[in-house]
Regions:
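Active-site/ligand-binding neighborhood in enzyme catalytic cores
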Residues: 1-75, 86
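Aromatic-acidic/polar surface patches that form glycan- and anion
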Residues: 42-46, 101, 107, 172, ...
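PAPS/PAP-binding and catalytic site of the sulfotransferase fold
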Residues: 49-56, 90, 179-185
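A structural signal for the hydrophobic beta-strands that form the central parallel beta-sheet
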Residues: 62-64, 91, 227
Length: 254
């Protein structure tokens, strides 16, 4: 009973997959992490993490909001015609599309998710906790009044509610209404007590975790482009950071 009421919905929200389909080593990693520390979010939003890393770099070093259309060993070109040259190039996302090469070691199976955000006039939970829905037929797997975790996420007197629908990331107005109604029912609130704000359909949210690499894999394509990212190891920020760091260390040795 405890497995079905806690572990199954909890782990499904983490891995975006049925726990039976996930490597046992990833379960041990996640369980150890949650046992050793507290779950937290940055007060300024998740973008605060890369922004903090960028602050250590010279102004102009990091360029965002640019669509990259071509990458080779020493050059990167963008859709607006700009190009940058470098001694070496590293790709950490959309590896095959950007390099134009087949990469057998890459995890090409992805799990998707839909996130819904609502403004709530009242908060029946009143605690900074993640609420799990153990009903296997429910649309909502988990939810949280995220402004209870970080008060900066909502204006004073209002509450930001986040809920997750694991599965095909295909949003429709019908699904929006169904999730809205189910969420109101779970909280015993009237439908109009929740105001839809935004939804995010993420088709490639996490790489599948049936088999994971115990150690981050360092790879170069045939034409010498370096590769990094969680799809080369496991679906955790740790893996994304570790593959990037190890690749950078190897690049400096060349």
């Amino acid at each position: 009973r405890y497995i079905d009421s806690f572990f199954r919905p909890f782990l499904k929200g983490i891995f975006l997959d049925d726990p039976e389909q996930v490597s046992a080593s990833m379960f041990r990693f996640v369980f150890r992490a949650f046992s050793a520390g507290d779950a937290a979010i940055p007060a300024a939003g998740m973008s605060a993490l890369p922004k903090a890393m960028r602050q250590a770099l010279k102004p102009g070093t990091v360029i965002t909001g640019v669509q990259v259309v071509h990458v080779d060993r020493h050059e990167v070109r963008s859709a607006d015609g700009n190009q940058w040259t470098a001694k070496q190039v590293l790709v950490s996302a959309a590896h095959e599309r950007l390099t134009g090469q087949n990469i057998p070691e890459l995890n090409k199976s992805w799990r998707s998710v839909l996130n819904f955000y609502f403004e709530a006039k009242t908060n029946p939970i009143k605690r900074p906790i993640l609420c799990l829905n153990a009903n296997p037929n429910a649309l909502i797997g988990n939810f949280c009044f995220i402004s209870d975790v970080a008060s900066t996420y909502a204006p004073q007197g209002r509450h930001l509610l986040s809920c997750t629908h694991v599965g095909e990331a295909s949003w429709t107005e019908t699904l929006q209404h169904q999730v809205h109604a189910e969420m109101a029912g779970l909280l015993s609130l009237p439908y109009d007590a929740l105001i839809p704000l935004k939804h995010y359909a993420i088709t490639q949210a996490l790489p599948a975790q049936q088999r994971v690499s115990p150690e981050p894999r360092l790879l170069q394509t045939e034409n010498g482009i370096w590769l990094a990212g969680d799809a080369l190891a496991n679906s955790a920020l740790n893996a994304a950071l570790a593959t990037g760091r190890l690749a950078a260390e190897d690049m400096l040795r060349v």
